[in-house]
Amino acid sequence: SLIVSMLLTGCVSSLSAQQSFWKEDFSAGKLPDGWMIVDSTKSAKCEWIVTDQPYPGSFQFEQQAPPIASTSRGYHMQFRPGVVTGEEITKWNQREEYPNGYFQTSAIDCTGKNDVVLKFQHLFRWNNWFTGKRAGLWVGVSNDGVNWKEYNVMDKIPAATQLHAPVNEEINISEVAANQKTVYLRFFWRDIFSWYWMVDDIELTEPFAHDLALEKVTSHQEIGNTFTKEDVLKVKLKNVGSQPVDEDFTVTASLNNGQKLTATV
């Protein structure tokens, strides 16, 4: 196994210390007041739901998945088009209909917030059969409910990948949300026939001036690796702070045998 930590010279890098000014973990077990769920399919068969249950599976009752193991656990938002399309993906494709749908928050007040970071945890599995031109898991941000800035949060996860741990997503949405009184968030499954998307622990925070996030290991799989002396370890870092990083910093990787690898960036 591999544990990667990160030190930023002269600055503090601690994502958990950020203070959120808005958060929703769905612990009430129902859709929050003022939120909306929209099914954009022609047959109106697919809708986001608030649930604490697993994805029940499809295609001869296979492809099941447990509920997202988010920080808050329990209730979360779940979209499960695979249950509806099942073995009839070809028929859906022939009639040019995708099981698209989204949920949207009520207005969030971001006045006085010069920088805004959207954080959430999600778990998904997708099928690349007959995907549409705008296929993706899209998070939209708007300050008027009409015009949207969208981010595809599939994170280049290959089709049919079974994720076991939630993806911790962080997006700096300051260009749309900073100092705006009516900010809306939208989570939109678009132009993919199956399987599911689970979302939980959505929050808005103010970023530190200098703050780096370690997104993922890019040279190897996240788990189950055996490293040799010839291996080159590569990771993807993301600046989620409000200011550019203009100082060198050190990335340290700790192997489970106690060995440490370091690199200056």
Predicted regions and their residues:
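Extracellular glycan-recognition surfaces and repeat-rich motifs
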Residues: 19-88
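Extracellular beta-strand-rich recognition modules
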Residues: 26, 103-106, 110-127, 137, ...
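Short beta-strands within extracellular/lumenal beta-sheet-rich domains
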Residues: 90-113, 167-170
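Terminal, low-complexity interaction segments
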Residues: 157-204
